[in-house]
Amino acid sequence: GDNQTLLVWSGEQMRTFYASGMYENKSSQNLLRQIDYFSNKHKHLEVARRMYANRFPGLDMSGMNMNQMRGAEGTRMKKLYQKLASEYNVQWNNRNYKSQDFDAQDDINKALTYGNHLLYNVCHAAIITLGFSPAIGFIHSGSMRSFVYDIADLYKEFITITPAFRIMSDGYHVDLGSDIRQAVRAAMQKNKLLKCVTKDLYKMFEIDNAPETLSTGIWDNVITYQEFQSKTLWGQKNTI
């Protein structure tokens, strides 16, 4: 509290996100702005358009409604999966996510599911750190993590999808979870994920003076108690 530090209760290596604790003097300004934009029909649609515009650079989406944008995104994702499958010579049928039966998925879908969960958890922590609500989504709805899914979708192509196909092109994996975790972590660092999330969130809600990056170190300090004792992270020295 004295150091204004966000505490996150998570599974090992951020595989799951259970809860968080925030210092009591944290400003609610960003949350109130998010609520204002969510409750205003025009502003709500504009936020959604800004999200989709990130994935369609150069395309004028000003006249498109939500269904049209969702349709365009669905087509884009289908083509992306097919392109990467061809590029990395990975067998691909379709995205087959089974939340209740992880083992029923083929290996490429397992890799995508695992990588996406890691991305969700880091985005969740970033959203809370910046004072927004993970539940108030503008494209997704009906979940306590709707906004997490909104934000994570901005970065999946480079953070989880491409690394997953690249990993699968290497052949058999003794520990697929470990391999995809390391690949996603490397992609997050290479693409400066937290800096992008911060910039995009402030741009989305037209907030000036966005911080250069998060000041709470939610990436550097996501460690278990055992890792804290041994001063290691992700199987190597904690020097990130």
Residues covered by each model-derived region:
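N-terminal, positively charged regions that mediate nucleic acid binding
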Residues: 1
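Active-site helix-to-loop segments that bind/position phosphate- or nucleotide-bearing substrates
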Residues: 14-240
